[in-house]
A protein has these predicted regions:
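Interfacial aromatic-anchored transmembrane helix boundaries in multi-pass membrane proteins
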Residues: 20-33, 58-92
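Alpha-helical transmembrane segments and their cytosolic interface
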Residues: 1-10, 144-180
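Membrane-interfacial segments
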Residues: 23, 27, 68, 72, ...
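Short helix-perturbing small/polar motifs within transmembrane alpha-helices
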Residues: 7, 11, 18, 75-122
Length: 180
């Protein structure tokens, strides 16, 4: 791994940790800027490095560094309803970066962003449901789980996607060579 790659991965992990703290603490999952950071990671890094940035972030939190929302961290985070979303960051960023390889058009950024957003929800919502219903003893319906973990987030996710596309279109040519 080149020094430039290590630096970019570290910067993206730091961005993700910072964006995690910019939150509105609602239950069961806070509204944060984490997904903005995940979009930027997928837009700016190679698939391998994007996956790695998500993995490093998750490991840092699990070993106790307060990088998760609300300055939380530790192995107990694993049983948080929000942890499925954290798990999803690796796959989401990696798949978005994979799709975007060699593509530069606005349409491709939007598609990559939608892929990343979908992956985040496809992993995060079932995990949240398992924790809430299985571990916490709630008896939420599928609709109630969607109302808690998806519906309130859609407007903000669309705004974050638009912002990430604008930022990445400006930053990517300066930061990333397509040979990554």
């Amino acid at each position: 791994m080149k020094a430039k790659d290590i630096t970019l991965v570290a910067l993206m992990v730091a961005l993700l940790a910072i964006c995690s703290q910019l939150s509105i603490p609602i239950q069961p999952v806070p509204i944060t800027l984490q997904t903005l950071a995940v979009l930027m990671i997928g837009f700016l890094l190679s698939p391998r490095n994007a996956f790695l940035a998500g993995a490093i972030y998750m490991v840092l939190g699990l070993i106790g560094l307060p990088v998760f929302a609300g300055f939380s961290g530790g192995y107990q985070s694993f049983i948080s309803p929000a942890f499925g979303f954290i798990i999803s960051f690796m796959a989401a960023a990696g798949l978005g970066a994979w799709y975007l390889q060699g593509k530069t058009g606005m349409k491709h950024y939007i598609i990559a962003g939608l892929i990343m957003t979908a992956v985040t929800y496809l992993i995060g919502i079932p995990y949240m449901g398992i924790i809430l219903n299985g571990l916490n003893g709630a008896s939420l319906s599928f609709y109630q789980i969607l109302m808690a973990g998806l519906i309130p987030f859609i407007p903000g996710d669309l705004v974050k996607l638009a912002l990430a596309v604008v930022l990445a279109k400006q930053l990517r040519p300066r930061l990333v060579s397509e040979s990554n």
